[in-house]
Amino acid sequence: MNILIANDDGVFAPGIQALADALKPLGRVVVVAPESERSGFSSALTLDRPLRPIQIAEDVWAVNGTPADCVYLSMNGLFDFEFDLVVSGINSGANLGDDVLYSGTVGAAFEGRLMKQPAIAVSLAGPDVRSYDHKDDYAQAAKWVHDFIAKGLPALPPRHIFNINIPDVPQLKGTQITYQGRRAQSKPITSHVDPRGRQVYWIGLAGEAVTDPQRIASQIQSDFFAVANGFVSVTPIQMDATNYAVLEDLQASLG
């Protein structure tokens, strides 16, 4: 099996290094990732300048582009063989609920799925993970991903991926299949004056999770709930954002 690994934290991030080490027993692992952090780039492709892949080690490449660029290049001519699976991560920080709209980790996985290959996005969720600087900090999460793939990935329809969030806890309680939760409105932006007297702004922090009473009543838990309670969250998500119930209502009322 040929496995392509990408991320949005950059080719030197400890999460991608831990993931590559963990998956090597499953086949050939090729890492193609941005040369520096590209968080928040979603599925963006670089169209205004050339991309320059640079091989920095055996089966490890750095690209001056976005996470989706890395996958696009890898599956459209950078290599003379095909990949069987795309794994994006392990991201330093959660990609829960509405986070998937912005996530370069998820964007890279979706790009792989557009190329007709199974794809998963993996993130490590916890308050301290942004400070982790060694691949051993991601070892438990990487092993979980190895085991998940080794057992055989469940089949998904076309244009679907698994979005996986692994809590940063001493011992995982298990795995829950979850729905994509949602957050309250983001915190307000913060404003400061820089040393040269110019006004600058920081995007506000992400909002808190919002509960869904209807889904709670049906005993389906959100990705937020699973991670907060020590479970790995596995959420099937899709590219098609059409609301078919509303579509049918509009057809009935306006058609």
From Swiss-Prot:
One Pfam family linked to the record = SurE
Asked if the Swiss-Prot or TrEMBL record annotates the protein with the keyword Cytoplasm, the reply is yes
What EC number(s) does this enzyme carry? 3.1.3.5
Q: How is the cofactor bound?
A: Binds 1 divalent metal cation per subunit.
Q: Does the keyword Protein transport apply?
A: no
The organism's superkingdom is given as: Bacteria
Which residues does the annotation say bind a divalent metal cation?
A: D8, D9, S39, N91
What GO terms are given for molecular function? 3'-nucleotidase activity; 5'-nucleotidase activity; exopolyphosphatase activity; metal ion binding; nucleotide binding
InterPro entries noted in UniProt: SurE, SurE-like_Pase/nucleotidase, SurE-like_sf
Q: Which cofactor does it need?
A: a divalent metal cation
Localization, per the record, is: Cytoplasm
- Recorded GO CC terms: cytoplasm
UniProt catalytic activity:
a ribonucleoside 5'-phosphate + H2O = a ribonucleoside + phosphate
The UniProt keyword set, sorted, is: Cytoplasm, Hydrolase, Metal-binding, Nucleotide-binding
Gene3D superfamilies recorded for this chain? Survival protein SurE-like phosphatase/nucleotidase
Listed NCBIfam families: PRK00346.1-4, surE
Family named by the database record:
Belongs to the SurE nucleotidase family.
What function does the entry list? Nucleotidase that shows phosphatase activity on nucleoside 5'-monophosphates.
Protein's name according to its UniProt entry: 5'-nucleotidase SurE
Q: Which organism is it from?
A: Acinetobacter baumannii (strain AYE)
Q: What is the lineage of its organism?
A: Bacteria, Pseudomonadati, Pseudomonadota, Gammaproteobacteria, Moraxellales
Q: Which gene encodes it?
A: surE
